[in-house]
Each structure stands twice: as structure tokens, then as C-alpha cells.
Amino acid sequence: MAITPNGFIAKKDDSSDFLTKKESQSYVATVLKAGALVIGRRTYGVLSKQSEFQKFLKAKIKIAIVSKHSMNIKSPYHKVANSPQSALNFLKGSKEIVVAGGGLLNASFMSENLVDEIYIDIEPNLFSEGIKLFEGGSFDVKLKLLGTRMLSKNEIQLHYKVLK
């Protein structure tokens, strides 16, 4: 998941215009490799307007949208789930599942101890207000660094294992 050095995954208005093309390519490759994605309602709304979304539709990526509200979904491979566990039940059988926000959803997965690994792509931008990587929730998690990878001369990916 892309974040700024000060911990934001999106601007206050849900904009992610600070993300680089390299980051977008990394995100798409990760989701296509995994084959399954969990996102929140607002993230689904933003993602469905981006060109990357067409690649997910074409590849028949299973997407669980965690929301308490009913919504118009774009594919029979997408489903609204009312909880993190319900989302995982829908995606059962997937070899990997990417959880990609927003901050409330990320925090709920961490609070319910449902995360095994975290990939954080640090983007070279700072802004003072926005959506944090984790919004709310109650957790205290230790991590072990598994590796780092340069995405570009200004972007680095950190790969952590969640210690349970």
C-alpha cells in the first residue's frame, strides 16, 4: 500500500493524485498476482474510475467491498461484505488476498488479527491532512522486516511480517 512518509494513504478528499506511475504499476501487479482484493466502499468508488480497474475486470479479480451499505457493483466477481471475516469467506480459496484500504478497513483487519504480511510503498510526498494508513481500531502489533525494494530512485517498498 502506498503511503507518504508521514503516514497518509490519500488526501482528505480521497485523492491519490500524489501516486507515481511506478506505484500504480506495482499496485496492479500485486493485485493481479494475488487474484483477490479487499477494499472499502469509498476506495471501490475511487478505484472503479481509474484505468487500472479495467485490468482487474479483464482478469476477473475477485473483489470484496466491505461496507454496511448496499451499492452498485461492476462485476459478478465483486461482492459487498459486511465485515472483514465475511470478505475473507467470499475470497476463500484465493492463494493471496490484498487488503488495500481505506484506513478504517486496514485498522479493522489489524484489530481482528487478520493480517500476515504488510507491503508499504513510501511515496516522496508530504501533505498535512488526509487518510491515515490505519484510522481507529485497537491493536498493538510487532513487525519483522522481511525485505526492502527500490521501486524507483525516490520510492522504496518495505515488506514486513506481522508477528503473532
Name what the model sees in each region.
Residues 1-164:
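Enzymes that bind and transform nitrogen-containing heteroaromatic metabolites
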